[in-house]
């Protein structure tokens, strides 16, 4: 199930105010899609809207917290009333959390899981039924992470949330096939990407030192790919119908290493962690 021509398609991107979400919104707009953008920080959408408008595109913007089921449903009701079912839903909104498991407060787990997992669940429950009922080729893209496949130390909450997104995507994809739906499902697993998610010090456990955080941020800045690389991969997956997309530095090698030897993968992850002072 692929969608070669995106002109006039209605595409919703969550977390569109920055990073991968912003780049994805601009990438789809360049393909001629009508964009529906939402973000917890409504003001962050203004420059994205302006960039799309200045390039001759069209979009609507909405301040929405994806953790709030009722708010996501209100957005869906508005979107459906305005133009019917979406053609593409990109569940991108997410947050990172850095910290050893024993140093991470339970509240940090709740925030991470509510945003990264329940945010996707709310998006699916609010938009997928109409997409399925409308018929025609449509697609859901869930943005997970390489961390859901090859977890690193001090990322237990984030890794667990992204692993859940991968499992959720796989299971729902099979259900869609069982009912012969024309809605396809793609899960995107970015590797090292240099975005603001790594620079948000609010999402860092008390046990992480300033030096450790600085080393990690320097590593992401030096080795991380640009968000636009992920955005192009998302657009490409919608056009080709790919179900799993690994993108960015280290994503494919670590994915295949995990399949070959989990023991060797763990050794590699420990070596990298020690290089950044996490020991």
Question: Model regions: which residues?
Answer:
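The beta1-alpha1 cofactor-binding region of Rossmann-like NAD(H)/NADP(H)-dependent oxidoreductases
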Residues: 42-43, 63-74, 106
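SDR active-site lid
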Residues: 177-245, 249
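Active-site helix of classical SDR
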Residues: 124, 161
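Conserved glycine-rich cofactor-binding loop
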Residues: 10, 17-18
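Residue(s) in the substrate-gating loop at a strand-loop-helix junction
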Residues: 145
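Substrate-binding pocket helix/loop in short-chain dehydrogenase/reductase
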Residues: 100-101, 105-110
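Conserved glycine-rich Rossmann-like NAD(P)H-binding loop of the short-chain dehydrogenase/reductase
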Residues: 33-47
């Amino acid at each position: 199930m692929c969608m070669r021509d995106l002109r006039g398609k209605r595409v919703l991107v969550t977390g569109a105010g920055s990073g991968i979400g912003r780049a994805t919104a601009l990438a789809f707009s360049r393909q001629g899609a009508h964009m529906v953008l939402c973000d917890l920080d409504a003001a962050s959408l203004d420059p994205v809207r302006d960039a799309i408008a200045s390039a001759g595109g069209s979009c609507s913007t909405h301040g929405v917290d994806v953790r709030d089921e009722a708010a996501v449903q209100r957005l869906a009701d508005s979107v459906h009333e305005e133009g019917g079912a979406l053609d593409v839903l990109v569940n991108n909104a997410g947050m990172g959390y850095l910290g050893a498991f024993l140093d991470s407060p339970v509240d940090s787990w709740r925030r991470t899981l509510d945003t990264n997992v329940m945010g996707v669940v709310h998006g699916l429950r609010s938009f997928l039924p109409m997409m399925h009922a409308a018929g025609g080729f449509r697609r859901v893209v869930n943005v997970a992470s390489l961390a859901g496949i090859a977890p690193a130390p001090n990322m237990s909450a984030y890794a667990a949330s992204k692993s859940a997104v991968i499992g959720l995507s796989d299971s729902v994809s099979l259900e869609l096939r069982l009912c012969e739906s024309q809605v396809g499902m793609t899960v995107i697993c970015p590797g090292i990407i240099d975005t603001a998610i790594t620079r948000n010090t609010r999402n860092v456990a008390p046990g992480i030192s300033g030096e450790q955080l600085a080393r990690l941020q320097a590593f992401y800045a030096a080795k991380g790919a640009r968000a636009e690389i992920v955005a192009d991969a998302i657009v490409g997956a919608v056009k080709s119908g790919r179900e799993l997309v690994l993108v960015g530095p280290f994503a494919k090698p670590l994915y295949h290493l995990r399949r070959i030897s989990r023991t060797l993968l763990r050794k590699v992850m420990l070596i990298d962690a020690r290089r950044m002072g996490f020991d």
